[in-house]
Regions:
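A composition-driven surface/loop motif
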Residues: 1-458
Length: 458
């Protein structure tokens, strides 16, 4: 424990067994550059109130509550965690990394388990409480929305450290919380590099503000959301593989400019919805049909693969696609769609093929500039049957092998041309469609967005 800064920069081994409460605590900045750090704690393993800065070292952490946290709520340039390197094996009953303001990770390797893992989620995949959930620590929460932050590298700027406490008090406060997130921040999570293996009972990556992914390789199994931002969520590079989730990727404005993204979700694959999470077991929005201002899904690049039991791509506002490649294996029930939007859906570039059930299917709107097709086949196609779309010369334009049954498909490609006839082949079925306008459809499904995706409790 230190009332001032605490720096660990040796190459030796430090082992801390904190059977009563916290492991390593600094009331100011906690800085670690090297060493083998082993911490077993009844409460928080490592805390720097003003900041935590880690550039190297090997960490083996088992925490009764939180793993690594920074808690200063009084200054916008404090309360951050910056990690540029290191190897972390971290098991926490609550959050693994929790920053009151910004969590910035530029490199390192991370093997993280929280709350007993995704199998011990507080909610079942259908949104009902999981009776196996054992944590009993009240209501979760990170830092407040809109809190200021340090620069993008997570380095605090300006300001003097707070005055030393007048009392000789070595205690720090652990907020009581059922929160069992892997990477959590109050204003922003910024990931520019690193290798991540996450198994979390709660959200794998969570911000009360924004999430920015510009690099790294993330593999996550989540008992709730794979990634959740109450503000904007942007992915421009890196690999994101969400192998298990309730909703895969969620934010008010989700923008994908690049990277390789794969999502498996028991509800929506990508969900864009406004407002704050409520914690209710009712995972639906209050108004399922109205379009929400400031809510958008934008896909401008990258490769996106979705396997969702709910809506594949769901925006309670607009959906715009200008580039990238998207494949959606959507719902098998008619109450959800491979695409779902409440505003407009516009495509000007890129390639998309999305399969799902008949009933609530939607395609792109006629405000698009690239041709698209929404087509319902005569009967259901079995799982693992290859779908191909060929032109009149037999040239394959698109292909996809959905792993679930489906009957409706929406597709778009720069190769589609008006007046051309294309053949849709799946299993024993083969049907033709002639492009007769910017949107060609034989569907009798939904013609407007529904907004089945809602915000939920953090």
């Amino acid at each position: 424990f230190s009332k001032a800064d605490l720096t660990i920069n040796g190459s030796g081994t430090l082992t801390v067994n904190a059977n009563y409460k916290h492991g390593i605590v600094s009331k100011d900045d906690l800085v670690i550059t090297d060493g083998n750090i082993n911490v077993t704690s009844a409460s928080t393993a490592m805390e720097g109130k003003d900041s935590v800065k880690i550039s190297g070292g090997t960490f083996n952490i088992s925490a009764g509550t939180n793993g690594i946290k920074s808690t200063n709520t009084e200054a916008s340039d404090k309360g951050f965690i910056s990690v540029t390197g290191g190897s972390f094996t971290l098991v926490a009953n609550n959050d693994a990394f929790e920053a009151e303001t910004v969590l910035s990770i530029q490199g390192g390797s991370f093997d993280i388990t929280t709350g007993g893992g995704s199998a011990n989620a507080s909610m079942k995949s259908d949104g009902t409480p999981n009776r196996n959930w054992q944590n009993n620590m009240g209501n979760g929460g990170g830092g407040p929305n809109g809190m200021g932050r340090p620069d993008d590298n997570g380095n605090g700027t300006g300001g003097e450290p707070p005055a030393m406490p007048t009392a000789d008090n070595t205690d720090t406060t652990d907020s009581t919380s059922t929160s069992a997130k892997a990477l959590k921040a109050g204003s922003e999570v910024n990931i520019n590099g690193g290798e991540f293996k996450i198994d979390s009972a709660d959200d794998s990556v969570h911000s009360n503000g924004n999430i920015v992914i510009t690099g790294g390789n993330i593999s996550a199994a989540s008992g709730d959301d794979g990634m959740h931002a109450s503000g904007n969520l942007t992915i421009s590079d890196g690999t994101v593989d969400i192998t298990k989730s309730y909703e895969g990727i969620e934010g008010s404005i989700v923008t994908i400019d690049g990277g390789t993204i794969s999502v498996v979700a028991s509800d929506d694959g990508i969900n864009c919805a406004g407002g704050s999470d409520t914690g209710s077991t009712d995972r639906m929005g209050a108004d399922q049909f109205s379009s929400q201002d400031g809510v958008e899904l934008n896909i401008n690049g990258g490769t996106v693969t979705i396997d969702a039991e709910g809506d594949g791509l769901d925006s309670n506002g607009n959906f715009t696609m200008t580039g990238g490649t998207v494949c959606v294996c959507g719902p098998t029930n008619g109450g959800n769609g491979a695409l779902d939007y409440n505003g407009t859906a516009t495509v000007t570039g890129g390639t998309l093929i999305a399969c799902g059930a008949v009933g609530m299917e939607e395609g792109f709107g006629d405000n698009s500039t690239q041709y698209s097709v929404l087509h319902d086949l005569g009967s259901t196609v079995s799982a693992n049957e290859k779908l191909t779309i060929t032109d009149s010369d037999g040239k394959e334009i698109l292909s996809f092998t959905p792993t679930k049954t489906w009957q409706s498909v929406v597709f778009t490609s720069a190769d589609l041309k008006e007046g051309e006839t294309y053949t849709i082949t799946a299993g024993s079925q083969s049907e033709t469609v002639t492009i007769d306008g910017i949107v060609t459809s034989n569907s009798k499904g939904m013609s407007f967005g529904r907004g089945h995706g809602g915000r939920r409790g953090f």
